[in-house]
Structure formats: structure tokens, C-alpha cells
Amino acid sequence: NGGSLLARVGEVLGTVPRVVSGDEEARLSFMGAVTGGIETFGPAGADSLVASLEGPVLVVDIGGGSTELALGHLAGGTATFTASASLQVGSVRFTERYLHSDPPRPEELSDCLSVAEATLDEVLSVQPSFGSATTLVVVAGTAETIGAVELGRWDDRELHGLAMSKAQVEDVFRTLATEPADDRRHNPGLPPERVDYIVAGCGILVTIMRRMGFAERLVSLGSVRDA
């Protein structure tokens, strides 16, 4: 119903919305992640990551149905987007497909991570340039939630730019994956709407860090609207 939706929006707003392509969305996501912040919306906010990072950067957005990868390069406070890919790997998709027990059984978790790794391998075989990234930046709800669980609270100022080591991410994954949903609901950093899907989302992030050799990940609250 995309066409009818756009027509209706146009009638209400008096202007026709522009639908961005997948590549353009990836570029905007990358630029927003590295140049946006929480202090100001728009490019190169005072707390943006572009001011403190150098070299090839991979931005990862783990969504409900897919995971988006965006690669770029930072140098001298300037960001350049270079490539993108979409993986049919997502927190809701994988929860519904693999994690049927509460808490998930070990074999369910193994299947979830194995398929995530195989899907990532397919992309890396076609686009090996993603393997050049030396910094991992994660964005959006899944990434922010994992950080909030580690902090024990949700605070945008603490989350933006938060570095978590691979060991810390693995520890959060082990904790969440072995708790029943009722216990996860009492975690002060975990929003109620993410209780059922965060295990798969965290497992996808763990898989990316393991497979691509990232020692840590940075959280960015920058988004498409900051690009």
C-alpha cells in the first residue's frame, strides 16, 4: 500500500514525500551515526564521533527483520560513505524462527548464531571491503538497549559514545539468554517492549563482533535525521 500511503500523506501535508533508496538510507544512516549526537541535531554536533575517530568505520543497525551494514572512512573530522549491505537477520525474525523456549535452549541459541554467522559470511564473501573496518559503531534500539543493560539504566548522555568491550557484550548476552522473560522484565535498563527480542538482537551483535574481530563497539544516538 506504499503508493496509496504516499498519496494520502501528500494530501494531508500538501507536498509529495520523497522515498529514499536503500543505498541512500544506508548513506544517511552512516553519516547520521558518525556526525550526529544528543546535544544538537544536524551534522557534526559537538559530541559527534567524527571528531574523535579515524579510519574505516562500520556502522551496524540491528533491526527487527534485518541488519543493515554501512561502511565508511573518517579522516580529519570528515566522513565519507563507501558501501552498504542488508542482511536478512533481525531480532524479531530470529526470535520467532529459532528462540521458542523461555529461556532459550542451548541448541536454539546455537542455531540462531550459526545462521547469523552464515548470513554474514555470504555478505563478506561478496563485499570483502567490510572486513577492513577497524571501528564498530552500533545504532538504534537494540544497540542502545544492550548498552542500557550494561549501565543498569537508560541515560542518553551516558549511552552516546559508550564503549563496550567484546567481553562485556558477551557477558550481557549470557545473562539475558539464561534468564526467563519474567526476570528480564525487572532489568532497569531493558524497556518492556524489547524483553522478548533482545536475546536474538544481542546474539546477532555478538556474532558480528566474533566473526569480524572487533574488540569493542561504540554506541551512537545519531540517526538519519542528523545526516
Language-model features, listed with the residues they occupy:
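Short beta-strand-loop elements within alpha/beta enzyme cores
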Residues: V59
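Helical "lid/coupling" subdomains associated with nucleotide-phosphate turnover
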Residues: N1-P56, L71-A227
